[in-house]
Design a protein with these regions (language model features):
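Acidic/polar low-complexity surface segments
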Residues: 233, 272-299
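Short beta-strand elements of solenoid repeat domains
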Residues: 263, 292, 299-301, 308-310, ...
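Disordered inhibitory propeptide/activation segment of secreted metzincin zinc metalloprotease zymogens
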Residues: 1-47, 102-123, 128
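Extracellular, beta-strand-rich repeat scaffolds characterized by small/acidic residue-biased motifs
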Residues: 85, 257, 266-268, 277, ...
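The catalytic-center signature of Zn2+-dependent metalloproteases
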Residues: 82-88, 94-101, 106-111, 154-217
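Zn2+-dependent metallopeptidase catalytic core
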Residues: 44-75, 161, 257
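Short pre-active-site segment immediately N-terminal to the catalytic Zn-binding motif
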Residues: 42-50, 141-160
């Protein structure tokens, strides 16, 4: 069980990190566990919905030192404390336009901060008796047209990852969060307020989105979340080959150790591969792969066409 911290996470004085930190965070026990579950409020979760949520939590767990544990399902999303021995930390529920008082809102993730969460749910007619632990809870608008949970590479999945980011304490780069930390704009980092670099950005809007939708946390999200919770030190340990896919998705390769390879041999056209951490390789206008900061990919295998391959600063084997 995690506890919503009563104090704020300290600013790092590094603007591209503080620009994504709200100040709210979970205090973790020795097992590093944050529990999650599904709750009903007139709309029932499907098996596919559960699978999609599991994939989203798995994507976050792969990059931070947190064990996300699925606890179960409750009939009323506000009542996990009455059903289970321990309350569920992050409860996910489905609502509609009436609940949100809007047809344009897709979802909402509450920061893990008691004062903030209680204030939000009070504005919706709840109180600490009817809804005793709202911190970190996430609600989705089932009536919004983009919220299709059948596709892991959809706008909806991108939004699920975004809302989990809020539940972990990440904020939008254009606002100050709870602690009033810097925005990217105030820090002179407006160029980083981009959905290509962080799930938490609103720019560009979905109506003019030109990238693939994210299937993992993005580079700046990983840096910020690892600052709060630490890094996962087991993901892709050992020698790993990461195959590039022309599947229309935006993803980050996070790899902790070994001698690793970026393999583009199944791509049917020449491309430019970049192995250095923080760099990206674009397969087409939608499919893009970032190399996470502190991830070292030593080797590359190109396509059967004309490629340009940039290595990283260590010893590389580059096969064209």
């Amino acid at each position: 069980m995690a506890i919503a911290s009563p104090t704020f996470f300290s600013a790092t004085k590094t603007d591209h990190i503080d620009g994504l930190i709200s100040g709210a965070y979970w205090q973790l026990g020795p097992d590093r566990t944050i529990s999650w579950g599904l709750g009903d409020f007139g709309y029932t979760w499907t098996t596919t919905g559960l699978q999609v949520m599991q994939e989203a939590f798995n994507a976050w767990e792969a990059v931070i030192d947190v064990d996300f544990e699925y606890i179960g399902y409750v009939d009323d999303y506000r009542k996990s404390t009455e059903v289970f021995i321990q309350p569920i930390d992050i409860m996910l529920s489905l609502h509609d336009n009436t609940f949100f008082n809007s047809s344009s809102i897709v979802g909402r993730g509450l920061f893990p901060n008691t004062e903030f969460a209680d204030r939000i749910v009070a504005s919706e007619g709840n109180n600490t008796i009817s809804y005793p632990q709202p911190e970190g809870d996430i609600t989705f608008n089932i009536e919004h047209p983009v919220f299709d949970m059948s596709n892991l590479g959809s706008n909806a999945f991108h939004i699920v990852l975004h809302e989990i980011g809020h539940a972990l304490g990440l904020k939008h780069p254009h606002d100050g969060g709870l602690a009033g930390y810097t925005t990217y704009q105030d820090a002179g980092l407006s160029n980083l307020d981009d959905g290509f670099l962080t799930l938490m950005s609103y720019d560009p809007t979905s109506s003019i989105w030109e990238y693939g939708w994210a299937s993992t946390p993005l580079p700046l999200d990983i840096i910020a979340a690892q600052t709060i919770y630490g890094a996962n030190t087991t993901t892709h340990a050992g020698n790993t080959t990461h195959s590039l896919l022309d599947d229309g998705l935006l993803r980050t390769v996070y790899d902790v150790s070994g001698t690793d390879t970026l393999d583009a041999s199944n791509i049917d056209k020449g491309i430019t591969l970049r192995l250095a951490q923080g760099n990206s390789t674009t397969v087409d206008t939608l499919s893009t792969v970032y190399i996470a900061v502190n991830t070292v990919i030593e080797n590359a295998i190109g396509t059967f066409f004309n490629d340009t391959i940039y290595g990283e600063k260590g010893d590389n084997t580059l096969q064209g």
